[in-house]
């Protein structure tokens, strides 16, 4: 992660010497900023430069259909497709936004000729499993209510599209009456917290919300399990959330949490880069990360970002046995343990009927 190379990218783009292509090769993972002794925010420079590249990033984006569908939501004529505030069932001061997980699931199936079985949408039902067990009332602010948060559009330099999405969502969130907005998506969380101006609304990642509200279900795994945790760039380096996910995972009895060589502030990026880097360079990052996972001896890799899950699952679709490890969102992992605990309790509650002689 050479900050000098980042400066060369910015300089070349300014002078139109490369048509902006190297600029879009930057993952905006903040690793170079983290390593810079002067704490220069290189990502912000790249963000600004991207908005000035004529023609935008069309040549760099692989998932064009997905991006076109989400960008189309920014237009006013799509407003009628979303439920108005007064007609939406909001009965709590806490709202949960799922992000575009269902869209990502469909895109992965489409991209891999229907061979994929990824279910990012599970994080939503998993989150509400945890909320219910905690006795916490949370209102679901679905994608029939709010539009895409605009994360990818912003980082691709499509400021006009992002501003429209932001204006629509911001108005509805503030009108909803909630004072806390929760999301399990690291990118949505970072976008709402950093790039929106939500008056009177606290934005939290689900792991933060669980810890703050005393999540402790006294869970245990049936068989001892070794797991490792992958820090998403948006959640870790950009928002400083490292311990909450680890605390939740380590709180499950029978689970041993082991760290990869690069973790925390030094964690490797999965290479997703706002869905712009589905190429050999991004693949090389995932292959290296998979090697680090194998070296830990972990049975499972847990993370807190649907894009990270999708990118690692994408690598698994290649069928290489070296990459055959379960990848799971931390919220889904916890919900799995809650369901197992409930099933065990139900089985224990059944009193066997003794046969009469």
Which ranges hold each PLM region?
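Short, conserved loop/helix-junction motifs that constitute active-site signature segments
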Residues: 218-223, 295-296
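Iron-sulfur-cluster electron-transfer modules
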Residues: 1-146, 152-183, 189, 195-196
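Cofactor-cradling patches in redox/metallo enzymes
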Residues: 106-121, 126-205, 234-250, 255-357
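A nucleotide-sugar donor-handling region in carbohydrate enzymes
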Residues: 203-213
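Short helix-to-loop capping/linker segments positioned immediately adjacent to catalytic or ligand/cofactor-binding
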Residues: 214-218, 236
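Hydrophobic alpha-helical positions that pack around
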Residues: 229
